[in-house]
Curated annotation (Swiss-Prot):
GO CC terms of this entry: cytosol
PROSITE patterns on file: CARBAMOYLTRANSFERASE
GN (gene name): pyrB
Protein name: Aspartate carbamoyltransferase catalytic subunit
Positions of carbamoyl phosphate binding: R49, T50, R99, H127, Q130, A252, P253
Length: 304
């Protein structure tokens, strides 16, 4: 079966196939199942974009959606994630979409369950569908990855988006740079080079900003965030020095006037809401791949 757990498990060919399917969906192609097929969304962390994007994608494909609430489930009675998935599998669910606060929650599950797991984000680890929608957005803009210079800016240590994107974009031929406060650098992420933000601003093709993840920090104070914006955020002054034709990206939710000046969120360079739109098409493509017998997706097996 075709789990989607991390970007490292996808070859360049597989990435290209998923992006091609996503582009087809973006251009109006329809694909709907004619048989009743249940898919469950299990979100153990809060989500707006990923959760609803998956649900829209599922419904566009004609799938029947089961939205799981941990607070109202037997998880509150101590049921394990494995038993929860096996329960859903037993009652006829054909795939599960999971977001979980634990890094690599899927390691012990992937060989024990008989339905595809689509990782919607694991702790500070991986976020493959966010990466794929970012790749689609970049491809739409530049038509290529080879030779592009991309800055990933902000809370690199705690960002699953940074980890997934840096690895995939490097594989596809882009050059990755990081800019981050010293305490938020991730020395384990070896797919890019750290440089000062102000050096990168006029050089890069893509300015990919990361959310300050205050829920993963001990404190979140207004004065600290103001200082962050001035030192590490995309201010109006920095945007004015950006390279001609370069774009701004952000996985959202956006902390306005922290990672990016509020007036830049929907400026001409910004592709933030385009990323959200592309999320639906990418997740349709990922679901097609996971359910080939139902949706006519890719029939080769991805070994994980």
């Amino acid at each position: 079966m075709s789990h989607l757990l991390t970007m490292s498990e996808l070859s360049e060919v597989e990435i290209s196939e998923i992006l091609k399917d996503a582009e087809d969906f973006a251009n109006g192609k329809e694909s709907k199942t004619t048989e009743q097929t249940f898919v469950a969304n299990l979100f153990f962390e809060n989500s707006t974009r990923t959760r609803f994007s998956f649900e829209v994608a599922e419904k566009r494909l004609g799938l029947d959606v089961l939205n799981f609430s941990a607070d109202a489930s037997s998880v509150q009675k101590g049921e394990t994630l494995y038993d929860t998935i096996r329960t859903l599998e037993s009652i006829g669910t054909k795939a599960v979409v999971i977001r979980h606060e634990q890094d690599r929650y899927f390691d012990e599950l992937k060989d024990q369950v008989n339905i595809p797991i689509l990782n919607a984000g694991d702790g500070c680890g991986n976020h493959p569908t966010q990466c794929l929608l970012d790749l689609l957005t970049i491809k739409q803009e530049f038509g290529r990855f080879e030779g592009l210079k991309i800055a990933i800016v902000g809370d690199v240590r705690h960002s699953r988006v940074a980890r997934s994107n840096a690895e995939a974009l490097t594989k596809l031929g882009a050059t990755i740079y990081f800019a981050s406060p010293e305490e938020w650098k991730d020395e384990d992420n070896t797919f890019g080079t750290y440089k000062p933000l102000d050096e990168l601003v006029p050089e890069v093709d893509v300015m990919m900003l990361l959310r300050v993840q205050h829920e993963r920090h001990d404190h979140y104070e207004t004065d600290i965030m103001k200082e962050y914006h001035e030192k590490h955020g995309l201010t109006v002054e920095r945007e004015q020095r950006m390279k001609e034709g370069s774009i701004i990206m952000h996985p959202a939710p956006v902390n306005r006037d922290v990672e990016i000046a509020s007036e830049l969120v929907e400026c001409e360079r910004s592709r933030i809401f385009k990323q959200m739109e592309n999320g639906v098409y990418v997740r349709m493509a990922v679901l097609k791949r996971a359910l080939p017998n139902v949706l006519g997706g890719m029939k080769h097996e991805l070994l994980v």
